[in-house]
């Protein structure tokens, strides 16, 4: 049927309606015609019926559209919701950002305010200091003017007043002096301190123009009356003397001077002006007393009669000018301007108590002055040697600057002395009297006299143990600083005793040239050159014992000439009285000295007992004890044995001078790298007994030439010199001014950055000593004198680059030692392992293109976000050195931190395979312990145990025939570094190590460590083929790796046994026919 449209709007496909079309309606009866209207009524109802019952085609057309519209509406709603949420988040972020910005700005303002307050406080302190200095200077000026006025009044006095005749005041003073002399001497024996008030020295000297030439009214020798160091009050001043203006006094004084110059006994020289100079009679103050020593100047040392007489008669008796605020040796200047030495050998490893002060003019009686000063210095040295905790140098060096510098450097010297006083002078002065003549026996003094400019006996090994009482010496001292001083003191004291016996037997023996030891640097030889310029025979003309004092003191005596008969009988009587009184005084003070020595030894014994150490002095002879008789030869005979060689064991090197490298602020809490680090390690090694099993060697300062093997000349000169010897350098060699290289730290000190502090006096010496100690130890191990070694040194060095100090480091000790091994010993292969938690950027820079030095560093890297930022795994070297720079750089932060498992795995899979393939001749270790548990995040953050480092050390000992040297680098937690050092030294000694915990053996390395190791193996496997074998075992635990290696070893063994078993079976059938061939 066709689907035609109809007027009623129905389509032809509507079959029910199609039956009622009009043509058919016309043939129907009329009675039914009414039904024609039915379609009109039925049609409206039929349409919904069709939709409901038959066809539903219109619905699929309308529903997708609606759903699409609904989906679009929902999408729009979601987008609007997301937009709203995004706007809310942005608004919240902006709000928080603004809040943080405000907080940060407030913190900045607060920080700036604090800095301003600190700056203002510092400025106020400076102003206050300047005000005090100005006030002090004004007081000095007033005192000086007052003295000049007094002097001018005396010069301009009327002719009618008395001039040459002693006044009533003078007579009263003389009488008071005689009555109080004995009381003053006894008082001076019991009081051993110096007044810090400079006016204390000026009390009774304003009348010096009236008290210069009268003979003394007491019979006490002037050479002993006035100690160089001791209690010095107004009553102890030189006796007031009459001026030498009358002819009879002039004649008498000149006669006395002539006799005194030729008199045999120095005890009779009371009035010998040129012999006893102002320096000798002046007390050694540590405060300022700057003045000239012209006759009548008052505040300077009281001049004796001969000086004034010589000046008045046209003979210039120049007296040395003494600058303000100078230390001990500045007062002990001889006639050439050089400084008198202490009798010990010149060791660069002990602190210097003085910097020397040049004299302004020659003194007319220099030889006798030197003689008395030489007797004074041993007395000081032997008294000081009993004081614990006092860091004293065994020598007073004389430099070219001191001889030729004149007064131009005096302000610099004063500045150096001011910097030195808080640590050196205070313990030195307290309780130590120093007399113009020695208080000990001749045998104890004479070695010091002759030792000053004689060479040391050849053939002594500096690191050798003492021939006698070495163990007793170690038990005697519990404080390591004082113990080291006593050990060195004992070695040199024995040698001096041996040497002085030869000198005594040959008093007129000509001088011999100074022999330098290998440890002495060229700088030290230059410092001692001044002492060599004057012949020894000029200083020691003859030796003769003084009757009655042979067992007390030995002094230089001049030949007796016939002119001695010109002396008046009265002088002889006075001399005898003075000699008897002098002898009595000597005995009293010798007894006092012995009592003090016994008191010190008892203190040591008590400290040893408190520490639980055995106390056994037995036959040990105290180092500072004098021989009781010149004829005693038992002690010198014992040191004639040849020095023993060092034991072939682990070597240790340490020096207390490195303790002086510390910030001037004095607060160690704000400076992680402080002196307590190495002091604690040394104490731990001593407490555990490890130090006694090792061989302790003597360190030295590295020379400037040695430093320049790694560092630039400007860097070496800037950080390897102190202000005193820096003045001798060419200013053009120093790049820029010194002040531009340092900054003021928040603590008030000075440094090159916030971490690397600088002490103008001690830092250069400590840094050079650290390098020299490492060099000495490395060379002794490399040459086979020692088995291995551990250097307890500071400051560290592996961050120091060619021209840049950083990270607490100034000179790269390990790199310098490696360079010198190549240059001096032609060592072809050197392995440097750096297990400090920070990358050794300085060491890497020094050998980045050297194929003969393999540098392996294990450090925290964190993609360059941990100090110093270098040490990426792809930094493999350059040029010929490609592949010889291995950075085992751990990345991943502290989630979780690296521990024993990770480091042991790195050693097993990276370090040891490469090291074995390299096959080094010497192994050097930059042994930083800041990866040990206990260090804060900025300084490490890892959780290694101390015993782990013992196992790492033990593995390295399998290389290079055991020639392994560890040098301390970082590590700032005292407990951690002490434990780790103990573990390493124990491993070096070959002791059985404590087993690792089972957890460490079973645990696998964390994912970050595995990824870091795989990356290193991937980079370096093309340079080191042995890494490929361990690439698959990085994820194994130690137990699993050991099991795998055992299985491989068993497999190899089985294969080898199979190959060995087949060969005999094949040979026997071959052999048997050959034996049977002849019968056939």
UniProtKB/Swiss-Prot annotation:
Residues 651-1080 are annotated as: Histone deacetylase. InterPro entries: HDAC4/5/7/9, His_deacetylse, His_deacetylse_dom, His_deacetylse_dom_sf, Hist_deacetylase_Gln_rich_N, Ureohydrolase_dom_sf. Residues 560-571 have a biased composition (Acidic residues). Keywords: Chromatin regulator, Hydrolase, Metal-binding, Nucleus, Repressor, Transcription, Transcription regulation, Zinc. Residues 132-162, 233-244, 258-273, 509-527 have a biased composition (Basic and acidic residues). GO terms for cellular component: histone deacetylase complex. A motif (PxLPxI/L) lies at residues 348-353. Residues 205-224, 625-637 have a biased composition (Polar residues). It catalyses: N(6)-acetyl-L-lysyl-[histone] + H2O = L-lysyl-[histone] + acetate. Its EC number is 3.5.1.98. Gene3D superfamilies: 6.10.250.1550, Histone deacetylase domain (3.40.800.20). Its main location: nucleus. Residues 1-25, 132-165, 205-312, 506-527, 558-579, 622-646, 1055-1080 are annotated as: Disordered. Disulfide bonds: none annotated. One of its GO terms (molecular function) is metal ion binding. One of its GO terms (biological process) is negative regulation of striated muscle tissue development. The active site is at residue 799. Zn(2+) binds at residues 663, 665, 671, 747. Belongs to the histone deacetylase family. HD type 2 subfamily. Responsible for the deacetylation of lysine residues on the N-terminal part of the core histones (H2A, H2B, H3 and H4). Histone deacetylation gives a tag for epigenetic repression and plays an important role in transcriptional regulation, cell cycle progression and developmental events. Histone deacetylases act via the formation of large multiprotein complexes. This is Histone deacetylase 4. It comes from Gallus gallus.
């Amino acid at each position: 049927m066709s689907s035609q449209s109809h007027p009623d709007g129905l389509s032809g496909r509507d079959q029910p309606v199609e039956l009622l079309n009009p043509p058919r309606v016309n043939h129907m009866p009329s009675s039914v015609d009414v039904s024609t209207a039915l379609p009109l009524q039925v049609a409206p109802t039929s349409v919904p019926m069709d939709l409901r019952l038959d066809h539903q085609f219109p619905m699929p057309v309308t529903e997708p559209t609606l759903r699409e519209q609904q989906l679009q509406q929902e999408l729009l709603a979601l987008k609007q919701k997301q937009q709203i949420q995004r706007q809310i988040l942005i608004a919240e972020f902006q709000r928080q950002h603004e809040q943080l910005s405000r907080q940060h700005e407030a913190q900045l303002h607060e920080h700036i305010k604090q800095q301003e307050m600190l700056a203002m406080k510092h400025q106020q302190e400076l102003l206050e200091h300047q005000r005090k200095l100005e006030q002090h200077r004004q007081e000095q000026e007033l005192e000086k003017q007052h003295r000049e006025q007094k002097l001018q009044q005396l010069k301009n006095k009327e002719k009618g007043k008395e001039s040459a005749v002693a006044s009533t005041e003078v007579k009263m003073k003389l009488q008071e002096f005689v009555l109080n002399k004995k009381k003053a001497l006894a008082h001076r024996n019991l009081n051993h301190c110096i007044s810090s008030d400079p006016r204390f020295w000026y009390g009774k000297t304003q009348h010096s123009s009236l008290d210069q030439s009268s003979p003394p009214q007491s019979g006490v020798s002037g050479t002993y009356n006035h100690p160089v160091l001791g209690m010095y009050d107004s009553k102890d001043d030189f006796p007031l003397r009459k001026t030498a203006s009358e002819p009879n006094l002039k004649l008498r004084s000149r006669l006395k001077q002539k006799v005194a110059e030729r008199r045999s006994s120095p005890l009779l020289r009371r009035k010998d002006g040129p012999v006893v100079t102002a320096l000798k009679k002046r007390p050694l103050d540590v405060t300022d007393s700057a003045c000239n020593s012209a006759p009548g100047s008052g505040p300077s040392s009281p001049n004796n009669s001969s000086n004034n007489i010589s000046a008045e008669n046209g003979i210039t008796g120049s007296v040395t000018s003494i600058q303000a605020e100078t230390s001990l040796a500045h007062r002990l200047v001889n006639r050439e301007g050089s400084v008198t030495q202490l009798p010990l050998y010149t060791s660069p490893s002990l602190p210097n108590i003085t910097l020397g002060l040049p004299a302004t003019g020659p003194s007319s009686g220099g030889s006798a002055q030197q003689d008395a000063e030489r007797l004074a210095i041993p007395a000081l040295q032997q008294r000081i040697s009993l004081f614990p905790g006092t860091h004293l140098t065994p020598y007073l060096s004389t430099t070219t600057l001191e001889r030729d510098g004149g007064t131009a450097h005096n302000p610099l010297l004063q500045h150096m002395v001011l910097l030195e006083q808080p640590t050196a002078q205070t313990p030195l002065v307290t309780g130590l009297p120093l007399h113009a003549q020695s208080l000990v026996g001749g045998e104890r003094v004479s070695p010091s006299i002759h030792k000053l400019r004689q060479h040391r006996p050849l053939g002594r090994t500096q690191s050798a143990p003492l021939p006698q009482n070495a163990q007793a010496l170690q038990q005697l001292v519990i404080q390591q600083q004082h113990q080291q001083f006593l050990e060195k003191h004992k070695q040199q004291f024995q040698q001096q005793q041996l040497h002085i016996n030869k000198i005594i037997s040959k008093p007129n023996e000509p001088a011999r040239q100074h022999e330098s030891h290998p440890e002495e640097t060229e700088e030290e030889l230059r410092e001692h050159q001044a002492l060599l310029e004057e012949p020894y025979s000029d200083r020691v003309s003859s030796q003769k014992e003084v009757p009655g004092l042979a067992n007390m003191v030995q002094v230089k005596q001049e030949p007796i000439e016939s002119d001695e008969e010109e002396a008046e009988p009265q002088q002889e009587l006075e001399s005898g009285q003075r000699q008897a009184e002098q002898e009595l005084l000597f005995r009293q003070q010798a007894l006092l000295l012995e009592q003090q020595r016994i008191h010190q030894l008892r203190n040591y014994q008590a400290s040893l007992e408190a520490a639980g150490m055995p106390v056994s002095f037995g036959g040990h002879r105290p180092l500072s004890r004098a021989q009781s008789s010149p004829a005693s030869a038992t002690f010198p005979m014992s040191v004639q044995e040849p020095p023993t060689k060092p034991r072939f064991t682990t070597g240790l090197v340490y020096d207390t001078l490195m303790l002086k490298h510390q910030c001037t602020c004095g607060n160690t809490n704000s400076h992680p790298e402080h002196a307590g680090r190495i002091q604690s390690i040394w104490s731990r090694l001593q407490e555990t007994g490890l130090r006694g099993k090792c061989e302790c060697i003597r360190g030295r300062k590295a020379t400037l030439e040695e430093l320049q093997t790694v560092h630039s000349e400007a860097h070496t000169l800037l950080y390897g010199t102190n202000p005193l010897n820096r003045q001798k350098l060419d200013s053009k060699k120093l790049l820029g001014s010194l002040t531009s290289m340092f900054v003021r730290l928040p603590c008030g000190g000075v440094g090159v950055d916030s971490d690397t502090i600088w002490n103008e006096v001690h830092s250069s010496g400590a840094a050079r000593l650290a390098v020299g100690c490492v060099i000495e130890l490395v060379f002794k191990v490399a040459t086979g004198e020692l088995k291995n070694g551990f250097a307890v040194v500071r400051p560290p060095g592996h961050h120091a680059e060619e021209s840049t100090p950083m990270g607490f480091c100034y000179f790269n000790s390990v790199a310098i030692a490696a360079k010198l091994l190549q240059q001096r010993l032609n060592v072809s292969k050197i392995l440097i392992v750096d297990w400090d938690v920070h990358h050794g950027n300085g060491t890497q820079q020094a050998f980045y293109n050297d194929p003969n030095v393999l540098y392996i560093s294990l450090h925290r890297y964190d993609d360059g976000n941990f100090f110093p930022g270098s040490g990426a795994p792809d930094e493999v070297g350059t040029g010929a050195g490609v592949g010889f720079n291995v950075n085992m750089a751990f990345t991943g932060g502290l989630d979780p931190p690296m521990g024993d498992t990770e480091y042991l795995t790195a050693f097993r899979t990276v370090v040891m395979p490469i090291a074995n393939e390299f096959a080094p001749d010497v192994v050097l270790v930059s042994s930083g312990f800041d990866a040990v548990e206990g260090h804060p995040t900025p300084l490490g953050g890892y959780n290694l145990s101390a015993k782990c480092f013992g196992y790492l050390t033990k593995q390295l000992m399998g290389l290079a025939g055991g020639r392994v040297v560890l040098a301390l680098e970082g590590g700032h937690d005292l407990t951690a570094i002490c434990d780790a050092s103990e573990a390493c030294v124990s491993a070096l000694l070959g002791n059985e190590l404590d087993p690792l915990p089972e957890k460490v053996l079973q645990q696998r390395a964390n994912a970050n460590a595995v990824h870091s190791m795989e990356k290193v193996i991937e980079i370096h496997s093309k340079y080191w083929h042995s890494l490929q074998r361990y690439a698959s075992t990085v994820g194994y635990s130690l137990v699993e790796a050991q099991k795998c290696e055992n299985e491989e070893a068993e497999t190899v063994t089985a294969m080898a046994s199979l190959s060995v078993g087949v060969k005999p079976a094949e040979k026997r059938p071959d052999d048997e026919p050959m034996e049977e061939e002849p019968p056939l």
